[in-house]
Every structure is written in C-alpha cells, then in structure tokens.
C-alpha cells in the first residue's frame, strides 16, 4: 500500500519552531511529528510514503533518510511549484500513487495526532464498497467547523454543512482518508480543496463513507493545540503502553522522559511533560504541561508550565516560564527572569522579564 502525507507550506502558526525545521520535523512527544504517522502506516503494510510539500523538501528527505532504512519504507517527495490546496497535490502525485494494483491509498494531514486506527479503516473501507472513506471525530462545539452529516448505521456521508447555525451533527473531518485510485480521476491539477470540492461530489454519488475515529484526536498545528495534544497523547500512551512513561517519587501524572536525559534531585515533573534527548534538568526544577526539546539545559529551581522550550535552549536558575511561552531554537533565558507568554525567535538571549505576551525578535 501507499500513502500521501499533506505536508503543506511554511508552518507559520507554529513559529518560532518552524524557523528551524519544517513543521512535520518539529518534535512531538520526543520524535518528529511526521514519524508518528509513518510508523503507524508501516504497521499496516504501507511500503511507500509520498510527502506532498512546497517548502524545503531537501531538508525533509535528508532528515528522513535514516528512518527509511530503519523502517524499511520508501519516502519520496512530490513538490508543488505553487500551492495546490488539499486535492491538487493528489493529482500532482498521481504517478507515484497509482501502480496498477487497484489498492486504495491513505491520505493524511501532517498536523493530525491520534491513535491512527489504520487497520480498522482498511477493514471498513473494504466492507462498504464505496470509493472513499474519511475518518471523522466528535467535537463539543460543531458550529465552529464543517460538519459531516452521515448515516449512523452504514456510515454513508449524506452532506457537509459548513459552520452550522442549527445542530445537524457533531462529527467533523479528522484529516485521515483512504481512497480508491478512481478518486484521482475526479481531481484536476490545479488549486482544489478535497474537503469542499471533491468529497461533496463523491458524497452526491453515494460513494463516500465515514468512520468515527476512536480515541483522541488533535490538530497540533499551533502552540495551544500542541500542548493539549501532548496531554491527550500521553493519556493514550498510559492506556496502551504504560512502561514507556516515567515513574518515580518526582513524577506527577503522565511524563515522557528520553533515556539520555538527566534529571537532578528534588525535582517535580508533571503532569503532561515531554523531556527530549540529551536534556539536563538540574536540582529543584518544576515542570508541568510543557515540552522540553532535545539538548535543553534547565538550571536549578527553574519553573516551567504551559510552554514549549525549543532545541538547545537554556533556562537560568530560578527563572519562571509560563502562559504559553514558546522559545525557539538556542534561546538563553537568564537567571531569575520571568516570561508571561509570548514567542522568542531562535538564538536570542532574554536578560529581563517579559511581563505580557509579546514577540521577541
């Protein structure tokens, strides 16, 4: 089987992290976001992954080359010269996706984190005999989204309603699809939306089906959702693979610590924390609801919450970082500095407190 991952463009919503790496290579729970998807695809027999990309393809391919060998999976790029929306990239990559076997192929949005129930998706797709299957997820406030109206028993999609003012359902597109090659005949090589143009046409022919996604789902393309997504991911990990989570008197709730990280005495870590490879956390540090990426050094008695600390940054003694502060790569926060939210671009030194959210350039 094959898969296409819609990587997209510049990752502006997740800056400053995407100033250092393309968004799919930004760490999530101690590994690049896109690697979560590729590993799950490999488990259900996908042998080739095509990355639909219009930004820095050489960085992506160079980085993923090692994982190609480790996973035994082929990773190639299909590069857009102009933005093609969410359907145009399928037409562009047609020759890479169609091999004459008639097998369906996956299409994923690269921002989506879930438990990736691909085996269930394949089984459902083959059972209904339609042309395309989309995964949907339930939301509390459907009026903010495009809602998928479907038959509860068969899963056949009846229509899509954009930001409904009256209740028509609570299921939205989860950005995970399994499509027959015939879907490509419906797509022209031009900027096109698969959600607003292609899927409604397939639904009108009664050939589009939806499967409700079990477990959690989150689009982690912006910082606040990234932090929420980490909490949901760690909750799921506790249910599926408890032995991967950290334990000890200094751990509170769900915490993921890379084996090469070093944590000092008297720390309190958690809940909902990921600490990456090569990190050093000195004595008396308090961490909660945050991600600490590869190579970060956190000095004594610092306190970090609701924040993302970019690669190879340093947080000084008694510093306090909170309220959705996002540090880019190689940022140095001084001793006793307080940051109350905001974005700090890579390679900056913060010597004085940031009392209200701002961008430090």
UniProtKB/Swiss-Prot annotation:
* Residues holding diphosphate: 9, 11-13, 23
Record protein name field: Probable mannose-1-phosphate guanylyltransferase 2
Q: Give the binding site residues for GDP-alpha-D-mannose.
A: 6-7, 85, 109, 111, 146, 173
**Which terms are listed as keywords in the entry?**
GTP-binding, Nucleotide-binding, Nucleotidyltransferase, Transferase
Q: What class of enzyme is it?
A: transferase
Could you say which EC number(s) this protein's record lists? 2.7.7.13
InterPro entries reported for this sequence: GMPPB_C (IPR056729), GMPPB_N (IPR045233), Hexapep_transf_CS (IPR018357), Mannose-1P_guanyltransferase (IPR050486), NTP_transferase_dom (IPR005835), Nucleotide-diphossugar_trans (IPR029044)
Which catalysed reactions does the entry list for this protein?
alpha-D-mannose 1-phosphate + GTP + H(+) = GDP-alpha-D-mannose + diphosphate
GO CC annotations, alphabetized:
cytoplasm
Q: Which PROSITE patterns match?
A: HEXAPEP_TRANSFERASES
Tell me one GO biological process term. GDP-mannose biosynthetic process
Span of the secretion signal?
A: none
Pathway, per Swiss-Prot/TrEMBL? Nucleotide-sugar biosynthesis; GDP-alpha-D-mannose biosynthesis; GDP-alpha-D-mannose from alpha-D-mannose 1-phosphate (GTP route): step 1/1
């Amino acid at each position: 089987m094959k898969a296409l991952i819609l990587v997209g463009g510049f990752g502006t919503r997740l800056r400053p992290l995407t100033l250092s790496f393309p968004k799919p290579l930004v760490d999530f729970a101690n590994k690049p976001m896109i690697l979560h998807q590729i590993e799950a695809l490999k488990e259900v027999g996908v042998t080739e992954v095509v990355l639909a990309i219009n930004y820095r393809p050489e960085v992506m391919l160079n980085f993923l080359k090692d994982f190609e060998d480790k996973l035994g999976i082929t990773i190639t790029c299909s590069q857009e010269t102009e933005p093609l929306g969410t359907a145009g990239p399928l037409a562009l990559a047609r020759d890479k996706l169609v091999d004459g076997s008639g097998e369906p192929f996956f299409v994923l949005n690269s921002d989506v984190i879930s438990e990736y129930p691909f085996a269930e998706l394949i089984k459902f797709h083959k059972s209904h005999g339609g042309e395309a299957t989309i995964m949907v997820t339930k939301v509390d406030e459907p009026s903010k989204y495009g809602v998928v109206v479907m038959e509860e028993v068969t899963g056949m999609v009846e229509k899509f309603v954009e930001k409904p003012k009256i209740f028509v359902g609570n299921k939205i597109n989860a950005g995970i699809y399994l499509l027959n090659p015939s879907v490509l005949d419906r797509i022209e090589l031009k900027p096109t939306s698969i959600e607003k143009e292609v899927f409604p046409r397939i639904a009108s022919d009664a050939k589009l089906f939806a499967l409700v996604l079990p477990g959690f789902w989150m689009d982690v393309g912006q910082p606040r959702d990234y932090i929420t997504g980490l909490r949901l991911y760690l909750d799921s990990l506790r249910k599926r693979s408890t032995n991967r989570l950290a334990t000890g008197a200094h751990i509170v709730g769900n915490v993921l610590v890379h084996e090469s990280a070093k944590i000092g005495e008297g720390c309190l870590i958690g809940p909902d924390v990921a600490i990456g490879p090569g990190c050093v956390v000195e004595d008396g540090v308090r961490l909660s609801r945050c991600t600490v990426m590869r190579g970060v050094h956190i000095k004594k008695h610092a306190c970090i919450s609701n924040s993302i600390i970019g690669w190879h940054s340093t947080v000084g003694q008694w510093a306090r970082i909170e309220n959705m502060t996002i540090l880019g790569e190689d940022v140095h926060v001084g001793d006793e500095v307080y940051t109350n939210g905001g974005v700090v671009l890579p390679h900056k030194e913060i010597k004085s407190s940031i009392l209200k959210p701002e961008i430090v350039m």
